[in-house]
């Protein structure tokens, strides 16, 4: 395997055995590709903005005299970049400009004669843009649009599984779901009549819709029934015989022909009888006349002589009718073929209950159902029905819907019209009747072939179309109204409705969510989330068990493990590692093709529908070196079932063992040894880990850590290879390799790093360079680590030395005992950044003012403010301190004579303002790290704002001039090379100042051209620099666009350092969570024979009942990894020669049975080996991929190599007594996370505070400064003790007895500790509620 320069710094030993056929794809592609499709110009007009415009335009006027046509669109450049948008609190978006053409036709002239054409570009609002990491910045906060899993458009056949009717009869139904438009349902009722519903309204007999489509009764029966023909010959009744139709019936008469009796009366007709009839080629048999009674006529029979209708279609025949027909000369009678087995008389019965008999009455009936209470007219009824399913504006199946519709009806072509046709409706009814007759199956709604993904692009396009449709109405009005000669397209279009629709979607849609930014993994998981909730989806309350359950088609598409616990379980899922969506939006997963029993490396992506037809082998099937299966019988999946197949039946094989799980679950080592419920908790808790101050890579990982860290976008990744030319804390400069440069550029890449910024979850985002000067780098190398990454690998927690043993009850019920050393070494110290904002508004009584001159506040409180009244950077503040001084004018109050006198003497004005300063919230203390002041245009900036502005200008100028210097240096080095190669002596050049080099001329024409090109570039560079500087200056000095009525906003950022303490929640990666119970002194912790104490003591009883054995294996493997690190450390300390070091590390990498990773340290230079050893001295990182991890024997080998006991247990000694514990204890290294459930955020105490308005009880919760509820169970406890007075106090004065609590307060102040309980307010509420029901209750005083 070839390692790039940075990967060589620390190589993870991989225990994976299966070859990696397919690299992990880019993890954010589902978001980025979808949005790209939305905004890029699509010449076909299938997707995105183009499709939306084409579906609405051209807009014609009602008269048809003019139309507004769409030509093209373009997106402008965003005004601010992403970072500026976040600071200013605005949306990162680009203006959309659309070229429209207004065409006016001649009125009197023949059709299509153009009178005038006007073309113009029109502004149509702003379109939010996606950042490179798949997020949107809306009003300054990062948001993610979650993809939705919804029912695919098409037709679905389903049944109620016998739950609707009391008899338990199964009722079948069919539903046609369009992408947009009305739903059409067909359903059977318990009497086996077929009904139709439109948009889930009142049901009508299904034949109404056929009559509305202009079918007569005769045609309807013709469509759905086969015919039985009777002929009257010589006063005898003969029936045309199709033997197959008799199967299973009991003969009601002797069936005979040509004198031979085939079936005797009363006998059951069997397959043998039918074969005989067919063999003898019997076409007619004679039947008794009574046999025809009860049969149903298939068409109208008219007396040709009189024109009288003797027997209408669908009428039951009787012997009298038969006589009439015979008399009127009808010798051939067609009846409907029905039986109880597989040809039910459903449509015939439905025609009988159908109240309508022609097209008009059917249309009226439909109109009445859709618009109850409106008088129907013929035109209204016709246009309503036409618009329901047959109008392209109102109804669209979409390409997906048409494909699913045609597949369901077994048609060959998969493309077609987006509206329904007569055939579509009839075929759906036919298939539904077939299913009722026992032919065909109902669909599985939860099959992933029937559910599709709607991603960002598609949802944004739909919203945009909604906005356009709103505009369309207005445009039609305008085209009809006015004087078209003076109008331009710009006057027609109002961009407000469009931008409102888009803004509403991105700002407040259920699927537009505040990004979970705890750590890189939570970001990636959030972007790969798939929700069944949201508009057009399910609701939590209505979703049953089936929808939430794992389905066989989830394999490789949706993760069976990662889903939230609680009411959303199973409704919110996560995309599997390799899954992607196809052109129709269905999820597909990759497989390796198997041809003639050989597994090839050819990859095919299959959707859930296609997968059903194949036999697919598991990824862990054993192959020989030629790719043949080793075993004769292979475990495979086929049609959703798992079973054994012979090896020549296999069509495909899984790509990877981690194909099944999501990114979060693929980061859990030894996942295969954990119970699924605990794995779910483990995957969910990794997303809640807070980035620690010093990231520490996991010793035991799965090999996915690098992919997650790089794809999440929190690290700085090299766009092109080169060498590091300059590096400091805030920027890295790379001199690009010659072969990767574009012609005529300076060849310098500059990466500016993010420093101490606040994330959405108030954690700290900070990037730190991990390359040093002069290092060669390649494209894709990690240059700087972000939060929770270590040398380009995800590092959510810390490796802790853990022991599984009880310790004085301090780890009872999942508590965790932690050593003081963990706190001293700042292992779990985290930085949290809080943003506090102070807004100064214009009020009715005058403007609020930000000032240090605050009434009734002592000097001490103002000590941290500058003269503008804003706290200075670096101040240490605690709860209650003033950050920004602000005064608000208050209304003039009636002054007392004394105050008037004081006013007159001192000219005092202090009393007409009140203090409304921004203070630090209670319980928060930290350091001010940044202050930003935003001032409205036209309001004078205060001193602090000007200082900040000046600082920003200086910084911008410094940054840009440094950038210019670096680029200039790059350019001049190339000019130097050209001049020297063109014959100028190097010594002379060195003496000449750089600026004058360009004045030199060369004789070689080609070199001279190169020189001139470079000179041009130099000028362009300086010009560009001036332009950039000017733009920056403008942005910094211009006023800010603030909300109406706001004059100034001051934002103060506080950094809070949180050490770990009792009450904080910690967890491993296997769902093993707990709360810290005690921080123990180092000297009291259990230690081994060398005196090394453990960091954490966990309860061994937490393992067996929860069945997450993965944590034990991780502990053992972590111990081995650390043991090898210790040996390398010892060798480095003894300064042994590199050869020995190389040999030992090579042994460690080679260990393990047939592992896929091949590391050859002989190709490494001595320097590289030393650097590798330096990075391995704290432990050798190990990857044990999911379902393909290290085996027990390999862990033992590794322990042996590290000179450790293979049992994984060692003798420990009690730190307090020095005595040995009675048995060996499992000790090792486990990766522990600190979760974002910190005791500091939860601890809270209340004295007298706010009360609820209605019940007068104290509020609840920390945010409301609320109390703890003394609930039902606590009342029972006091009742059980008979503590009557305590109970009375709890229910009255301590809670909601208003008079009682004020009296109590007074009494306490007076030193008299008496209480006089009265009536609790909640009792009054109860009385009022009963009275509101009309029952009067009066309380009588005894």
UniProtKB/Swiss-Prot annotation:
GO MF annotations in UniProt: DNA binding; DNA-directed RNA polymerase activity; ribonucleoside binding
InterPro entries, sorted: DNA-dir_RNA_pol_bsu_ext_1_sf, DNA-dir_RNA_pol_bsu_external_1, DNA-dir_RNA_pol_su2, DNA-dir_RNAP_su2_dom, DNA-dir_RNAP_su2_hyb_sf, RNA_pol_bsu_bac, RNA_pol_bsu_CS, RNA_pol_bsu_protrusion
Keywords associated with the record: DNA-directed RNA polymerase, Nucleotidyltransferase, Transcription, Transferase
UniProt-listed Enzyme Commission number(s): 2.7.7.6
GO (cellular component) term, any one: DNA-directed RNA polymerase complex
Catalytic activity: RNA(n) + a ribonucleoside 5'-triphosphate = RNA(n+1) + diphosphate
UniProt GO BP: DNA-templated transcription
Recorded family membership: Belongs to the RNA polymerase beta chain family.
Function: DNA-dependent RNA polymerase catalyzes the transcription of DNA into RNA using the four ribonucleoside triphosphates as substrates.
Subunit (UniProt): The RNAP catalytic core consists of 2 alpha, 1 beta, 1 beta' and 1 omega subunit. When a sigma factor is associated with the core the holoenzyme is formed, which can initiate transcription.
Name of this protein: DNA-directed RNA polymerase subunit beta
């Amino acid at each position: 395997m070839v390692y790039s320069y940075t990967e060589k710094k620390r190589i993870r030993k991989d225990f994976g055995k299966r070859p990696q056929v397919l690299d992990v794809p880019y993890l954010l592609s589902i978001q980025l590709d979808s949005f790209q499709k939305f905004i890029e110009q699509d010449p076909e007009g299938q997707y995105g903005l183009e499709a939306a415009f084409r579906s609405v335009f051209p807009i014609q006027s009602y008269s048809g005299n003019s139309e507004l046509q769409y030509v093209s669109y373009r997106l402008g450049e965003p005004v601010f970049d992403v970072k500026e948008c976040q600071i200013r609190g605005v949306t990162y978006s680009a203006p959309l400009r659309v070229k429209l053409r207004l065409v006016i036709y001649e009125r009197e002239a023949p059709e299509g004669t153009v009178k005038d054409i006007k073309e113009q570009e029109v502004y149509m609002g702003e379109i939010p843009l996606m950042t490179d990491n798949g997020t949107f910045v809306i009003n300054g906060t990062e948001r993610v649009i979650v993809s939705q899993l919804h029912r695919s458009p098409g037709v679905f056949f389903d049944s109620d599984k016998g739950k609707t009717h009391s008899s338990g009869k199964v009722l079948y139904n069919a539903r046609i779901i369009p992408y947009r438009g009305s739903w059409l349902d067909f359903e059977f009722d318990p009497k086996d009549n077929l009904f139709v519903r439109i948009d889930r309204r009142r049901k009508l007999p299904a034949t109404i819709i056929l009559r509305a489509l202009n079918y007569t009764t005769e045609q309807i029966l013709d469509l759905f029934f086969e015919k039985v023909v009777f002929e009257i010959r010589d006063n005898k009744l003969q029936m045309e015989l199709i033997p197959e139709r008799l199967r299973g019936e009991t003969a009601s008469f002797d069936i005979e022909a040509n004198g031979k009796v085939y079936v005797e009366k009363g006998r059951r007709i069997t397959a043998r009888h039918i074969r005989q009839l067919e063999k003898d080629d019997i076409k007619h048999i004679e039947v008794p006349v009574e046999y025809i009674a009860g049969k149903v006529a298939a068409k109208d029979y008219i007396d040709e002589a009189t024109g009288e209708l003797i027997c209408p279609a669908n009428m039951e025949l009787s012997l009298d009718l038969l006589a009439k027909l015979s008399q009127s000369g009808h010798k051939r009678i067609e009846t409907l073929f029905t039986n109880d087995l597989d040809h039910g008389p459903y449509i015939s019965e439905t025609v009988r209950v159908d109240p309508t008999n022609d097209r008009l009455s059917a249309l009226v009936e439909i109109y009445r159902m859709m618009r109850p209470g409106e008088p129907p007219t013929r035109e209204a009824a016709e246009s309503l029905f036409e618009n329901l399913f047959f109008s392209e504006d109102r109804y669209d199946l979409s390409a997906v819907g048409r494909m699913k519709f045609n597949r369901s009806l077994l048609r060959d072509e998969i493309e077609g019209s987006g509206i329904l046709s007569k055939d579509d409706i009839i075929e759906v009814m036919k298939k539904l009747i077939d299913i009722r007759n026992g032919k065909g199956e109902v669909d599985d709604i939860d099959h992933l072939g029937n559910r599709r993904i709607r991603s960002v692009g598609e949802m944004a396009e739909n919203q945009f179309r909604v906005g356009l449709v709103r505009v369309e109405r207005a445009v039609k009005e305008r085209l009809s109204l006015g004087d078209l000669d003076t109008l331009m397209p710009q006057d027609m279009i109002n961009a407000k409705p469009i931008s409102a629709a888009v803004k509403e979607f991105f700002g407040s849609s259920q699927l537009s969510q505040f990004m979970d930014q705890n750590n890189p993994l939570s970001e990636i998981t959030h972007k790969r989330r798939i929700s069944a909730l949201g508009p057009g989806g399910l609701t939590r309350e209505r979703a049953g068990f089936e929808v939430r359950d794992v389905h066989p088609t989830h394999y490789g598409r949706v993760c069976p493990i990662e889903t939230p616990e609680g009411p959303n379980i199973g409704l919110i899922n996560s995309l599997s590692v390799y899954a992607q969506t196809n052109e129709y939006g269905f999820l597909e997963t990759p497989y390796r093709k198997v041809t003639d029993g050989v597994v090839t490396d050819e990859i095919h992506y299959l959707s859930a529908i296609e997968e059903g037809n194949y036999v697919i082998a598991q990824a862990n099937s054993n192959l020989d070196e030629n790719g043949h299966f080793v075993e004769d019988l292979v475990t495979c999946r086929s049609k959703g079932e798992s079973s054994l197949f012979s090896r020549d039946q296999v069509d495909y094989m899984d790509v990877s063992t981690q194909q099944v799980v999501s990114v979060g679950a693929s980061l859990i080592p030894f996942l295969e040894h954990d119970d699924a419920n605990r794995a779910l908790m483990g995957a969910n808790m990794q997303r809640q880990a807070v980035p620690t101050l010093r990231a520490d890579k996991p010793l035991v990982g799965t090999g996915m850590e690098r992919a997650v860290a790089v794809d999440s976008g929190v690290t700085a990744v090299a766009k092109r290879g080169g060498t590091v030319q300059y590096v400091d804390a805030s920027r890295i400069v790379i001199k690009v390799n010659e072969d990767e440069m574009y012609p005529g550029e300076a060849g310098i890449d500059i990466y500016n790093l993010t420093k101490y910024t606040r994330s959405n979850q108030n954690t700290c985002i900070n990037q730190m360079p991990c390359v040093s000067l002069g290092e060669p780098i390649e494209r894709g190398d990690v240059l700087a680590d972000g939060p929770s990454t270590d040398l380009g690998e995800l590092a959510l927690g810390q490796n802790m030395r853990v022991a599984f043993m009880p310790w004085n009850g301090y780890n009872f019920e999942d508590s965790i005992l932690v050593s003081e050393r963990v706190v001293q070494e700042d292992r779990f110290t985290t930085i949290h950044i809080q943003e506090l904002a102070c807004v100064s508004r214009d009020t009715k009584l005058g403007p609020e003012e930000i000032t240090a001159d605050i009434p009734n506040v002592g000097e001490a409180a103002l000590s941290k403010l500058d003269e503008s009244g804003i706290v200075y950077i670096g101040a240490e503040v605690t709860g209650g301190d003033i950050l920004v001084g602000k005064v608000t004018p208050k209304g003039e109050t009636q002054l007392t004579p004394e105050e008037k006198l004081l006013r007159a003497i001192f000219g005092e004005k202090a009393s007409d303002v009140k203090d409304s300063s921004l203070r630090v919230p209670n319980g928060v203390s930290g350091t001010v790290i940044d202050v930003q002041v935003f001032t409205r245009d036209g309001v004078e900036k205060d001193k602090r704002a000007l200082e900040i502005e000046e600082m920003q200008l200086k910084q911008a100028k410094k940054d840009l001039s440094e950038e210019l210097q670096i680029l200039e240096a790059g350019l001049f080095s190339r000019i130097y090379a050209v001049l020297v190669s063109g014959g100028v002596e190097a010594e002379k050049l060195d003496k000449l100042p750089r600026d004058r080099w360009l004045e030199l001329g060369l004789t070689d024409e080609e070199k001279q051209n190169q020189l001139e090109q470079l000179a041009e570039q130099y000028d362009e560079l300086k010009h560009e620099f001036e332009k950039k500087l000017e733009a920056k200056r403008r942005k910094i000095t211009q006023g800010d666009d603030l909300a109406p009525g706001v004059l100034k906003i001051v934002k103060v950022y506080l950094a809070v350092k949180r050490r770990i303490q009792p009450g904080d929640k910690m967890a491993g990666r296997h769902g093993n969570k707990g709360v810290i119970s005690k921080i123990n002194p180092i000297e009291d912790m259990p230690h081994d024979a060398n005196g090394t104490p453990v960091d954490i003591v966990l309860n061994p009883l937490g393992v067996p009942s929860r069945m997450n054995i993965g944590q034990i294996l991780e502990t053992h493997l972590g111990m081995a990894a650390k043991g090898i690190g210790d040996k390398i450390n010892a060798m480095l300390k003894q300064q042994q020669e590199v050869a020995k070091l190389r040999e030992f590390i090579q042994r460690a990498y080679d260990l393990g049975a047939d592992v896929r990773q091949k590391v050859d340290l002989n190709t490494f230079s001595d320097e590289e080996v030393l650097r590798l050893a330096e990075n391995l001295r704290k432990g050798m990182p190990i990857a044990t991929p999911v379902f393909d991890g290290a085996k027990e024997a390999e862990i033992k080998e590794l322990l042996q190599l590290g000179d450790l006991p293979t049992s994984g247990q060692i003798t420990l000694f009690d730190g307090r007594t020095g005595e040995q514990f009675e048995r060996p204890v499992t000790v090792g290294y486990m990766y522990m996370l600190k979760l974002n459930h910190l005791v500091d955020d939860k601890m809270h105490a209340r004295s007298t505070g706010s009360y609820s308005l209605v019940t007068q009880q104290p509020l609840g919760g920390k945010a409301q400064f609320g109390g703890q509820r003394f609930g039902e169970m606590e009342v029972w406890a006091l009742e059980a003790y008979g503590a009557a007075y305590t109970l009375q106090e709890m229910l009255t004065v301590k809670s909601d007895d208003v008079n009682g609590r004020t009296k109590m307060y007074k009494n306490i102040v007076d030193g008299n500790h008496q209480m006089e309980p009265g009536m609790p307010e909640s009792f009054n509420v109860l009385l009022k509620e009963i009275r509101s029901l009309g029952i009067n209750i009066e309380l009588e005083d005894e």
